[in-house]
Amino acid sequence: MSNLFFVILLAVGFGVWKVLDYFQLPNTFSILLLILTALSGVLWCYHRFVVLPKRHRQVARAEQRSGKTLSEEEKAKIEPISEASEFLSSLFPVLAVVFLVRSFLFEPFQIPSGSMESTLRVGDFLVVNKYAYGVKDPIFQNTIIAGEKPQRGDVIVFKAPQQALIRTGLGATRAAFAENLALSSKDNMSGVDYIKRIVGKGGDRVIFDVEQKTLKVVYGKEGKPCEIDCETKAFEYTQNPTNPAFPNELELTEKGDVTHNVLISEYRRYSDLEFFPQEGMQTAEWLVPEGQYFVMGDHRDHSDDSRFWGFVPEKNIVGKATYIWMSLEKEANEWPTGFRFERFFTAIK
C-alpha cells in the first residue's frame, strides 16, 4: 500500500506540473505545493494511523511468542515499510509549514531585472509580506481576511495583467487586448510576478510629464475622481551625485508620497504611441479605476509599467516588499560574482 501511494504521488505531481505548465496558470507553484502537501499528508496519516499500529501489534505478538524483546533489525523484518514512502510521508510536516508560511505570511522573491534600480538591484533577494493587505487564499487570490489597503509609495509584488506580457511597445495594442480580455474573462491575471511602486490608486489622476519626466497626482476621494477642492501632489526632484553603480544614468531623489531615488536616462525619448491610452484622457494622463492601482518602476526609462499597459487590479497583488535579506553581485542573465553585504537585511523604502 505504501509503494502504491509513492507511485501515485510521483505520477500526480508530474501530471499536474505538466498541465499547469501547459496552460500557464497563475500561482502554479502554490497549486503544486498544495497537492504535494495534501498527498504527503495522506501518506503520513496512513503511516501514522494504519501502518505503525499494525506493525506494533505484529511486533508485540512476535515478542510474546518468542518470549524475548526483538532487536531493531528483527523488528524491521516484521511488516517492512518502504523507505521511499516513509521518507515522503516524513516530508509532510515540512511541506505543511512551507505551504502555510509561503501562502499566508512571507514569500521569498528575487529581482531578475533592473526596472526598480536603484532601490532594488538585480541579484537582490526580498521578503514579501503576504498579510500586509489582508489574507488571501493562495490559489485564486480571493480575500479571506481583509487588511489595510495598499498605499501610494508602497513597493508591491503582483501578478502581471495579461496585456503586460504582450511583446510590443504600442500602448494602443495593449489597451485593445485589455478591453477584449475584460469582455471574455473576469480575471486579468498571468502567472508572471512583477515588482513595482504604487504611484496612484483608485480615483487618482496620474500625469506624467513626457519632457521633464516628472509626476503629478491629483488625489481621488474614497476611490472616486475628485471634482472640487482637489489635493494635487507635484513630485519634487533633486539631483544626486553620480552613482558609481549607474555611471550612465542620472540619479534623482523623488519626493512624493514617499522619498526615494529614481534613475533617469537623459537620452530616452517617448512617443505618444507607446503610452496606454485611456478614453477621455490626454496622452500620458490616466484616471485610475476604483479597486485598481497605477504602478511604475524606479528605473523610469527602463521599466515596463502602467504607463504602457494600464492598471493592476487589487486582486492581483501578492504582497508588500518589506526588506532585502540577501544580495548577490550580478547582472541580468549572468552568474553572480560575489555578495553585496551592505545590502543584507536592509528595509525597502
From Swiss-Prot:
Example GO CC term: the record gives: plasma membrane
What GO terms are given for molecular function? serine-type endopeptidase activity
**Membrane-protein topology:** Multi-pass membrane protein
Q: Which UniProt keywords apply?
A: Cell inner membrane, Cell membrane, Hydrolase, Membrane, Protease, Transmembrane, Transmembrane helix
Against InterPro entries, the record matches this protein to: LexA/Signal_pep-like_sf, Pept_S26A_signal_pept_1, Pept_S26A_signal_pept_1_CS, Pept_S26A_signal_pept_1_Lys-AS, Pept_S26A_signal_pept_1_Ser-AS, Peptidase_S26
Q: Which Gene3D superfamilies does the annotation name?
A: Umud Fragment, subunit A
Give the main localization category.
membrane
TM region(s), chain numbering: 3-23, 25-45, 81-101
What EC class is this? hydrolase
- Write down the Pfam families for this protein, in alphabetical order: Peptidase_S26 (PF10502)
Q: Which CDD domains match?
A: S26_SPase_I (cd06530)
For the keyword Cell membrane, the answer is: yes
Topology Periplasmic: residue spans:
102-349
Q: Which reaction does it catalyse?
A: Cleavage of hydrophobic, N-terminal signal or leader sequences from secreted and periplasmic proteins
Q: Where in the cell is it found?
A: Cell inner membrane
What Enzyme Commission number(s) apply to this enzyme?
Answer: 3.4.21.89
Asked if the record carries the keyword Acetylation, the reply is: no
Please provide the Gene Ontology terms (biological process) for this protein. signal peptide processing
Q: Which NCBIfam families match?
A: sigpep_I_bact
Record's family? Belongs to the peptidase S26 family.
Protein name according to UniProt: Signal peptidase I
Q: What is the lineage of its organism?
A: Bacteria, Pseudomonadati, Pseudomonadota, Gammaproteobacteria, Pasteurellales
